[in-house]
Amino acid sequence: MRLCDTDIERYLDDGIISLTPRPNNDKINGATIDVRLGNSFRVFREHSAPFIDLSGPKEEVSAQLESVMSDEIIIPEGEAFFLHPGTLALATTLESVKLPANIIGWLDGRSSLARLGLMVHVTAHRIDPGWEGKIVLEFYNSGKLPLALRPNMVIGALSFEVLSGEXKRPYSSRKDAKYKNQQSAVASRIDEDKE
């Protein structure tokens, strides 16, 4: 069952769900709570790699990823990150999210931003039970104009569902959890996938 605004507020008050810094209650709407853009970004840098072999040997995949991803880019407050048409960038939410083992979260982009061509998450919008950390956003500008993205702007909304029971393998307890406690725009760790 998806939580309504009253339950989201109560779960935050009771510490069942945690968002740090906690958004004001006026950011809770119907069945969602707004989240803001953090200041950590990563982009694909200019490279000569013809492709990345996603099923190749782990060492080669790791080297290919390292050759195409930028280091972390920190955008100072008041400045903007410009996302150009046809460009993918990684960023984070300002808020760090912590979920218990019986709640799953969902991230949705804002309709107003989508109407300008901004995709906030390319495919990964599920926040696993037991998650703790910032949410990495996979931005894609499918529009015709560059978009100025500023830290602290409302970038999306989270909704939450209570599971039928407590997950046996919540994200926080998995040894293979590649993005546990992430606090920055972490690049793909597909090279760490199990065989």
Swiss-Prot record:
Keywords: Hydrolase, Nucleotide metabolism, Nucleotide-binding. GO terms for molecular function: dCTP deaminase activity; nucleotide binding. Its EC number is 3.5.4.13. DCTP binds at residues 110-115, 128, 136-138, 171, 178, 182. It comes from the Bacteria. It is an enzyme of class 3 (hydrolase). Homotrimer. Belongs to the dCTP deaminase family. This is dCTP deaminase.
